[in-house]
Curated annotation (Swiss-Prot):
Annotated InterPro entries: Calycin, Lipocalin, Lipocln_cytosolic_FA-bd_dom
Chain's gene name: LGB
Signal peptide as annotated in the record: 1-18
Organism from which the protein derives: Trichosurus vulpecula (Brush-tailed possum)
Pfam families reported for this sequence: Lipocalin
Disulphide-bridged cysteine pairs: C79-C172, C122-C134
Protein name: Beta-lactoglobulin
Length: 174
């Protein structure tokens, strides 16, 4: 019984340390993110309804002020182009995004990228600093780069979440 309690305690400590050790990238070269990205999969909180990660990214652009502009393609009856402004923050890999339909602000953090193949990002509620959704994007469809890194990030989510794999036939093509 003592061994079981010790094992559970040590496992909990390791899990807490793993959660605290995954942060956004220390440095980010925004210019290398420019271009299209295809969503591969997403993990999001059960109650999280914002569709930002449900879309392919047609274009990432840098504004003269150093912010990012995302042009995404949303699948409705047809493909609709939408633009989002991501305002830079003090941290190079974190951007603030306001979503008018939700009347809420979120922090979009670039967790990991190799710039050429994949990018992993997470949305956090600005008020609660809790990850609400994380997504895995690739430059080319079906490359499967960054899968292990994405799984590590998903394991740090502290809330119940749903995994959603992209159905490329149902998504707008970039």
């Amino acid at each position: 019984m003592k061994f079981l309690l010790l094992t559970v305690g040590l496992t909990s400590i390791c899990a807490i340390q793993a959660i605290e050790n995954i942060h956004s990238k220390e440095e980010l070269v925004v210019e290398k993110l420019i271009g299209p990205w295809y969503r591969v999969e997403e993990a999001k909180a059960m109650e999280f309804s914002i569709p930002l990660f449900d879309m392919n990214i047609k274009e990432v652009n840098r504004t003269p002020e150093g912010n990012l502009e995302l042009i995404v393609l949303e699948q409705t009856d047809s493909c609709v182009e939408k633009k989002f402004l991501l305002k830079k923050t003090e941290k190079p890999a974190e951007f603030e995004i306001y979503i008018p339909s939700e009347s809420a602000s979120y922090t979009l953090s670039v967790m990991e990228t190799d710039y050429d193949n994949y990018i992993l990002g997470c949305l956090e509620n600005v008020n609660y600093r809790e990850k609400m959704a994380c997504a895995h994007y690739e430059r080319r469809i079906e490359e499967n780069k960054g899968m292990e890194e994405f799984k590590k990030i998903v394991r740090t989510l502290t809330i119940p979440y749903t995994m959603i794999e992209a159905q490329t036939r149902e998504m707008c093509r970039v």
